[in-house]
């Protein structure tokens, strides 16, 4: 039995379910409704993530959404990590899938950047620092938030592999692929030169 499976299938499945249950909580939708702003899915991109919440003009609400979406990746991983590395990775996968495909919203969720960050914080804070450096550097230089996130996410499994975290690297290879898939519209706009830049009005 490999170390990742040492906890046994019941623990892995329980961790996956725990992660999904946390990840599927649509904080962006909940917070905007509680704030009296209606359904965030009816504005902007229709996404439930922090970037679209920011389009309501409420920066504090967007920041709260970002924090909550990150924590729903961090907390289940830390909890499941008490059972071993395998359950921690399963919880991370579950949280990310829950955010992208929440059952409560017809499996139409966010794009996953905040939850990606949250899972990474729990599993490799050092790699998160590298992710942040790449994201901030590219965002500052090119003014494309989506491109910065895509590049940082693609670099993440490579960095993890270089640090000797093979199992975590494999997980983030899957997460990065899903994140890129969810960003397909952004990628098309980047290719066409129509993607909005950071700070751009209208």
UniProtKB/Swiss-Prot annotation:
Q: Which one GO biological process term can you cite for this protein? A: phospholipid biosynthetic process
MF GO annotations:
acyl-phosphate glycerol-3-phosphate acyltransferase activity
User: Which EC number(s) does UniProt give?
Assistant: 2.3.1.275
Q: What class of enzyme is it?
A: transferase
- List cystine links: none
List cellular component terms (GO): plasma membrane
Membrane-spanning regions, if any? 11-31, 87-107, 116-136, 158-178
- Pathway(s) it belongs to: Lipid metabolism; phospholipid metabolism
Q: Where in the cell is it found?
A: Cell inner membrane
- Judging by the UniProt lineage, the source's domain of life is Bacteria
Listed SMART domains:
G3P_acyltransf
Cross-referenced Pfam families, in alphabetical order?
G3P_acyltransf
Which keywords does the record carry?
Answer: Cell inner membrane, Cell membrane, Lipid biosynthesis, Lipid metabolism, Membrane, Phospholipid biosynthesis, Phospholipid metabolism, Transferase, Transmembrane, Transmembrane helix
Similarity comment: family membership = Belongs to the PlsY family.
Function comment: Catalyzes the transfer of an acyl group from acyl-phosphate (acyl-PO(4)) to glycerol-3-phosphate (G3P) to form lysophosphatidic acid (LPA). This enzyme utilizes acyl-phosphate as fatty acyl donor, but not acyl-CoA or acyl-ACP.
The UniProt entry, under HAMAP family, shows: PlsY
Assembly mode: Probably interacts with PlsX.
Q: What is this protein called?
A: Glycerol-3-phosphate acyltransferase
What broad taxonomic lineage does this protein's source fall under? Answer: Bacteria, Pseudomonadati, Pseudomonadota, Alphaproteobacteria, Hyphomicrobiales
- Gene symbol here is plsY
């Amino acid at each position: 039995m490999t170390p990742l499976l040492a906890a046994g299938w019941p623990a892995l499945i329980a961790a996956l379910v725990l992660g999904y249950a946390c990840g599927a909580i649509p904080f962006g939708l909940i917070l905007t409704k509680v704030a009296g702003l209606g359904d965030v899915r009816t504005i902007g991109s229709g996404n439930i993530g922090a970037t679209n919440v920011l389009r309501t003009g409420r920066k504090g609400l967007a920041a709260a959404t970002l924090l909550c979406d990150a924590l729903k990746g961090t907390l289940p991983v830390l909890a499941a990590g008490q059972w071993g590395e395998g359950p921690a990775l399963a919880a991370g996968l579950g949280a990310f899938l829950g955010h992208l495909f929440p059952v409560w919203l017809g499996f139409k969720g966010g794009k996953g950047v905040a939850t990606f960050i949250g899972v990474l914080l729990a599993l490799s804070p050092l790699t998160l620092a590298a992710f942040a450096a790449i994201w901030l550097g590219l965002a500052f230089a090119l003014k494309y938030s989506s491109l910065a996130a895509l590049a940082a996410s693609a670099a993440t499994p490579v960095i993890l592999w270089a640090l000797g975290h093979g199992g975590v690297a494999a997980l983030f290879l899957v997460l990065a692929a899903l994140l890129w898939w969810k960003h397909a519209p952004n990628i098309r706009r980047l290719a066409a030169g129509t993607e909005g830049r950071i700070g751009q009005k209208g």
